[in-house]
Design a protein with these regions (language model features):
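Contiguous, glycine/small-aliphatic-enriched amphipathic segments in soluble metabolic enzymes
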Residues: 2-132
């Protein structure tokens, strides 16, 4: 089922796409992102897109025992529906392996790249908003 909102003309429009950056890979951001589907799922009036390292998210999901499906997202293939157990991810590879609670300066560029992509997406209208 395609989630839609009504525009001012009454015609259906796609719900807004919100970009969420995972933040520092050694921090709590990846875990918070993984909890988004259970919190919002199919009932949200918006679509969520997580910007981060897919492998890191998969590893943290396994560690937490979360049954979350990570789905690759591209601008050319946006997903029209919201699913309660699925997280759409725009993959940005880590610069260095991440250990929870241990910051690695080598991943600073990774974090800046996430923020830059989210800002550019908002400026171009691709994303309706960003959360960091």
């Amino acid at each position: 089922m395609h989630a839609q909102c009504s525009g001012t003309s009454g015609e259906p429009v796609s719900p807004p796409l919100i970009a969420i950056t995972c933040g520092e890979p050694a921090g709590i951001g990846p875990e918070l992102c993984l909890r988004l589907p259970e919190r919002f799922g199919a009932k949200a009036p918006f679509r969520l897109l997580v910007l981060g390292d897919r492998g890191l998210l998969a590893e943290r999901a396994r560690h937490l025992g979360l049954a979350v499906t990570l789905r690759d997202w591209t601008p050319e293939n946006p997903f029209p529906s919201l699913l309660a157990d699925t997280l759409d991810v725009l993959h940005f590879p880590l610069t260095a392996p991440a250990m929870p609670g241990r910051l690695d300066p080598a991943n600073a560029h990774h974090v800046l790249n996430l923020l830059g992509r989210a800002v550019n997406g908002c400026m171009s209208g691709e994303f309706a908003a960003m959360v960091t």
